[in-house]
Amino acid sequence: MPFNICITNAIFKMNNKKFLHKKLLLLTLLALFISQVGIAQKVVRYDLYVKDTIVNYAGKEKRAIAVNGQIPMPTLEFTEGDTAEIVLHNQLKESTSLHWHGLFLPNKEDGVPFLTQMPIEPGETFTYRFPIIQTGTHWYHSHSGLQEQIGMYGSFIMHKKADDKTFRKGIDDLPEIPIMLSEWTNLRPENVHRMLHNASDWFAIQKGATQSYAEAIRTGNFKTKLKNEWKRMMAMDVSDVYYDKVLMNGNHLTDLKSIDGKSLKAGDKVRLRISNGGASSYFWLRYAGGKMTVVASDGNDVEPVDVDRLIIAVSETYDVVVTIPENGKAYEFMATTEDR
């Protein structure tokens, strides 16, 4: 009996000693983990003030929505490992929200009213907070009503860490320009929505894709036009809407001579982070200075490939690298709608 007791005590002491060592090891590892997380998770905060504004893009003053006084919305930039803290201040007379297109994040931060959150009502402030766990070019926009169509869209860029194993020298360290493509119509977005719902051919007539009733009568095609409309065979086009203006970073034309104060010279390479924030237009992209090198698509790195032109669909993003060929000359980067 004493023998058994001695053995039992010896085992207990040994197990207790192992337990203390394991506990100490776990506490040490936990402390290291917490310290690393604290270093890695830098909080990057943006305050976004959403407010009505008046613009004149196409000859008439029209209502639009500006964020921090600008269209498109400010470009939001982060580095993988950061924590994004985006505070939206709603100064509109209607509710609003923000959706992060293509981002991996907690569902409650996704920005869809009545699904992942309640609408942000007039006068309210709402904070989106989520970890940045990916890299690449993406964009963000309102997910309330038709606010995106009148200005609530912007670039969302997530950079790689310098020690990232996928970091590509000569690509990921180049000077960058975010480019947001969009369209503008002087029609209220609610009217555009109604005309599309009613299958109106007014936009097709404006673009010359179909004949008006007067033209159909004059050319002897009135019967055919009526027959097609009776069959609901409306004139088709690549884009359903006629737009008064195409915008690049909120302007029809931009003259760029430097990036972050540094003048561009022959041989310099520039990375263009391009997002199509348009409502319905595909854009053909061309560069007068030579070929473009595609290096990423929808936020994902791709094997670099040279192209003469590139088409970008609604909501897509592309990263392309262009080279400045000569000094003292302007080289046009042009976006043309496919239904031109």
Labelled PLM ranges:
Residues 41-314, 321:
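Histidine-centered copper-binding motifs that mark active-site loops
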Residues 1-22:
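N-terminal secretory signal peptides that target proteins for export/translocation
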Residues 275, 319-331:
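A conserved active-site cap/scaffold subdomain adjacent to cofactor or substrate pockets
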Residues 36-40:
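Sec/Tat signal peptide C-region and signal peptidase I cleavage site
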Residues 145-151, 328-340:
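Terminal connector regions
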Residues 27-35:
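Bacterial N-terminal signal peptides
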